[in-house]
């Protein structure tokens, strides 16, 4: 248990599990210099579970600031990356009494971006599984899926998002 500040992004190699004690007793946030970076970049056969990710922002110029993305050139040999029992809590940079989560800022950290175009050509699939995950992402997209990626979304929720789930048919990508 505890609160941890880490330099984002955290790269999770193939077959590795990042496991907290429980989502309410382990909180992960970025260092001040990495607040607008992605939190986790996942390879295939990896897992992140039992923690809360918070206090990061979205950088629209670099399309960074997601809790979860595929690692560049990722591969899935046996199973997709798996995210379980995780809460993502973000807010915009400008908050007020009438907008306590910064919905109007439009720069709160986002939940996940799944882009099948960055999969390695020999990857079995370009998918990610979410189970019992909550994205509190005010004024921004909670989950975006594009370019042939797949998502399993089991018992998950988005709150305060401008778009809870956005699925875009891209022009590139594995199995797209």
Which ranges hold each PLM region?
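Short, intrinsically disordered, charge-balanced linker/junction segments flanking boundaries
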Residues: 1-5, 67, 173-176
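N-terminal extracellular ligand-recognition/capping segment immediately after the signal peptide
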Residues: 1-17, 21-36, 52-57
